Amino acid sequence: MVKVYAPASSANMSVGFDVLGAAVTPVDGTLLGDNVTVEAAEQFSLQNLGRFASKLPTAPQENIVYQCWESFCREIGKTVPVAMTLEKNMPIGSGLGSSACSVVAALVAMNEFCGKPLNETRMLALMGEMEGRISGSIHYDNVAPCYLGGMQLMIEENGIISQQVPGFDEWLWVLAYPGIKVSTAEARAILPAQYRRQDCIAHGRHLAGFIHACYTRQPQLAAKLMKDVIAEPYRTKLLPGFSEARQAAMEMGAQACGISGSGPTLFALCDKPDTAQRVADWLGAHYLQNQEGFVHICRLDTAGARVVG
């Protein structure tokens, strides 16, 4: 029996649309992510458990974990009969890499169970492919940090899919999920087909400056450069109360604030625990819309997906 935990992730980070992502873990020890268990069996079966299991497709073939099993078996050239259990602790359509959690946990669990026949690069490529089935296009900005941990920059050249970018230990990520769903496909459809030259230049400057600031250990400069001219100006209309929440977070001392992934989760970056707590309390009172919403104060999850049983 193998049990794997895969952590939540925040893609884009305002400054790196489709090319940056960070794995996150709550400072209070709460597990924010999915678990997948694999056990030997005579034939394949899949059981869904966890807080958000009711949101999953009822037909096993439509479940991404089943599709991961099928693709993994095809990849290694043999059918491996197993009993799989998905603990779905992540809300779907939250902007926290929910589908990536399930994909990464399922594939890592299968790879561990079978004695690691696939290497890291092949695993990551397969993860991107599976993620693409849900979002409509292959992208790695959730699966790469979820699998490998830390902040990841998508390279996709010379056989390298992604590489780690050094983060800052003092950064606290306040993540507020309001409890509503935003589909990745819908959030992509709202974006323009073409961008103005000055927006392209600003985007390049922000992203290059951010990566430079990370490597030269300038946390305040890095945070200052976390600006989004590509997606946020268009996606805010899908997120009730986002503009007010961002303004409030910045006034309370957040270093940066933006949309996590395609939303509706908001992230606010703080460098002091008391600031993070103030921002978290405000968001809990004003940004959440129902009982399914939550706020977590997180740090970077540097471990990524891991065997927990």
From Swiss-Prot:
The keyword Cell division does not apply. The keyword Cytoplasm applies. Keywords: Amino-acid biosynthesis, ATP-binding, Cytoplasm, Kinase, Nucleotide-binding, Threonine biosynthesis, Transferase. Its EC number is 2.7.1.39. Pathway: Amino-acid biosynthesis; L-threonine biosynthesis; L-threonine from L-aspartate: step 4/5. InterPro entries: GHMP_kinase_C_dom, GHMP_kinase_C_sf, GHMP_kinase_N_dom, GHMP_knse_ATP-bd_CS, Homoserine_kinase, Ribosomal_Su5_D2-typ_SF, Ribsml_uS5_D2-typ_fold_subgr. It is found in: Cytoplasm. ATP binds at P91, I92, G93, S94, G95, L96, G97, S98, S99, A100, C101. It comes from the Bacteria. GO terms for biological process: threonine biosynthetic process. It catalyses: L-homoserine + ATP = O-phospho-L-homoserine + ADP + H(+). GO terms for molecular function: ATP binding; homoserine kinase activity. GO terms for cellular component: cytoplasm. Belongs to the GHMP kinase family. Homoserine kinase subfamily. NCBIfam families: PRK01212.1-4, thrB. Catalyzes the ATP-dependent phosphorylation of L-homoserine to L-homoserine phosphate. This is Homoserine kinase. The lineage of its organism: Bacteria, Pseudomonadati, Pseudomonadota, Gammaproteobacteria, Enterobacterales.
